[in-house]
């Protein structure tokens, strides 16, 4: 692994490779430690070995504002299994050691960052091999203290482009973000029940005009056709969270079935890119 392949470098290398192949990225989300730290690592292995181009990982948190019941369930299972922030950083370091070129992003809430001290949190994230951090409850307008700490530690700050954002917000997201842009397919909480269906072409063309980092479409991405549609509309790929976590919830007591089902789902979603 070259010394230069850090933070945004891993995203750039991944997007460049996919572009050369004429493909998009499939990026699954899971909560670290769900349903247990040990099984969590096997789940991540299964995702990567079956075609995940990058990972989006959450730290368990007991009051996730933006998350629907599926991801809240993941948070509670992980906490019940005793997963602490320290355990999360240890898991991240193991994943990084196994997959030196894989982009690894964190998606979490400001409280978890504050609890560590902002600078200390990003320092730990860097040591664990994290490439990017998205703080779900901090809008771009209020993000300066986090972004400055992120950049000081070579970590890409990720921002959400909401479906109802005006041009001013999209310009700010484009200028402030690194690595990739998290494009919401609809406002609200995460989940598979209301399918992603917002026409995103307009936002995608604006993001392109503002030279934003590559946009990944998230929220409600649960089936291969949605991945294909996102990429066709101009996204660099798609993020799927609740659909992945739902598989973990359903098969949490049957490890073999869980990993097999997750492998099949990941292969099908990746094939759609």
Swiss-Prot record:
Tetramer of two alpha and two beta chains. Pathway: Amino-acid biosynthesis; L-tryptophan biosynthesis; L-tryptophan from chorismate: step 5/5. One of its GO terms (cellular component) is cytosol. The lineage of its organism: Bacteria, Pseudomonadati, Pseudomonadota, Gammaproteobacteria, Alteromonadales. The keyword Acetylation does not apply. Keywords: Amino-acid biosynthesis, Aromatic amino acid biosynthesis, Lyase, Tryptophan biosynthesis. GO terms for molecular function: tryptophan synthase activity. PROSITE patterns: TRP_SYNTHASE_ALPHA (PS00167). The alpha subunit is responsible for the aldol cleavage of indoleglycerol phosphate to indole and glyceraldehyde 3-phosphate. It is an enzyme of class 4 (lyase). The keyword Iron-sulfur does not apply. This is Tryptophan synthase alpha chain. It catalyses: (1S,2R)-1-C-(indol-3-yl)glycerol 3-phosphate + L-serine = D-glyceraldehyde 3-phosphate + L-tryptophan + H2O.
